[in-house]
Curated annotation (Swiss-Prot):
Taxonomic placement: Bacteria, Bacillati, Bacillota, Bacilli, Bacillales
The protein, known as: Uncharacterized protein YisB
Domain of life of the source: Bacteria
Source organism of this protein record: Bacillus subtilis (strain 168)
Gene transcribed to yield this protein: yisB
Amino acid sequence: MAKQIAGICELCGRSDVQLTEHHLTPKEEGGTFLPTAMLCIPCHKQIHALYTNQELAVRLNGMAELRSDPELARFVKWIRKQPPEKLIKTKKSNERKKKK
């Protein structure tokens, strides 16, 4: 994850959180110069824990797609209730573990 600034997460909408730049199409899939989103660290980590870079490039390469994904939507619903300073542990999903 790159530079961090404080602001509002584009995915969960929490404010006063540390933000990181998320490449909507991963850099290794050709997204170096494509659009990015500023996400809080827990949202950013959760996206990469749930999905491979290939999945992100093909199926979840926009904010609308990320917001409408059922698995990520459950996380967003939960994280919105958490205080900005809370540290979140993230684990890879079982589906992602199987793909390795």
